Amino acid sequence: MCAPHHEGWDQIHDVSKGFLDVDLYTRIMDGLVNDDCQFDHIIFQWLGDPSLHPDLPALLNIAADKMGGRVGYLRVDTNAIRLPPDRMEGILAAARPDVPLLVVFTLDAHTAETYTKVKGQDALERVRRNIRYLIRRRKELAVPLNIQLQFVVQPGNDHEAGDFLQYWSDLLGCQGGEQWHDELMFKRLSVGGGAVGQAAADRLYEKTMKRFDIQAGKRGGVEVNVWGSRPWQDDDEHDGGRSACPGLWITPVIRHDGHLMMCCADLRGELSLGSLAEHGFRELWEGKAATQKRMEHISGRFEGVCEGCGGINWYETTDSMVSSAQKRAKALGL
């Protein structure tokens, strides 16, 4: 939870807040099926916590019903503040063997004091209680639901990374099992697309991982994941390594108003391709505007919102992605 959320602002990054209409969402899912779209996963989160949506379980069920065989898994990213037992039951009921569910809990703290400092409110005990309930009920019901607990290393919480690892690896080691794939994710802090402070944040991350000997691999019944690479191709101390950003190919975002965004890092929504209430996904995603932006990157031109961004570094732009964009550009006469 960042300041725009806990302070109740009307807008986040110049985008008016709101809930995705269930009827519109259903039409969008139908459109994805009609366009024969397939995804590795679908994340229910962008510029807000999905647990705020009153119909979250319904959205999960609709996606599972319509995208079965077209998506590897569904993913919900949440702080768990608004997920008491009755709402956790709705999430548990949405998990299915053919469309597994991953719930990512963003915690970033081990003590109440640090949680309040990082998150903006004193809610750690409530959050832990909600998560423990989910873990316990998952075991009782044998639900195909995996869990990831995240810790974003930053000034003010880095001293708690070791305790965080110990607490949750012990709990999941006891309440988890081989039928699930649970993870503890230690993430680097992202500073404005690689803006001033990013390199310092990366150094703090690396120092913290070394200090507590946190390494990728199995620990008890949980998989520990770390970020080995910088989050951005360029940042305040690294320049000249910029290449075509993979976000333009593999991170489409459907905003709550139905607009299709081209990149998950475009927080101000400058790369809107149009509304999925009026157009098909492929029509927009493979259209002139999207293809032109990809070709700009391939040629080394980073304009508009991309000029001030360091370029996503946690995915890779492959040769096949470049080739597909070039072929599409030729077909469109660009």
Report residues per predicted region:
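Conserved beta-strand->loop/alpha-helix structural units within folded catalytic cores of enzymes
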Residues: M1, D40-Q45, P50-H53, L149-Q150, ...
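Local cysteine-cluster metal-coordination motifs and their immediate loop/turn environment
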Residues: M1-H6, M262-A265, E303-W314
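Radical SAM enzyme [4Fe-4S]-AdoMet core and its adjacent flexible, acidic
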Residues: H5-L20, T26, C37, K66, ...
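Conserved Radical SAM active-site core
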Residues: Q11-R75, I81-P97
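Short, flexible loop/turn elements at secondary-structure junctions
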Residues: W46-G48, T78-A80, L107-A109, F151-V153, ...
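Hydrophobic side chains within well-formed alpha-helices
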Residues: R87-M88, F281, V305
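Cysteine/selenocysteine-centered motifs that mediate thiol-based redox chemistry or coordinate metal-sulfur cofactors
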Residues: E286-L334
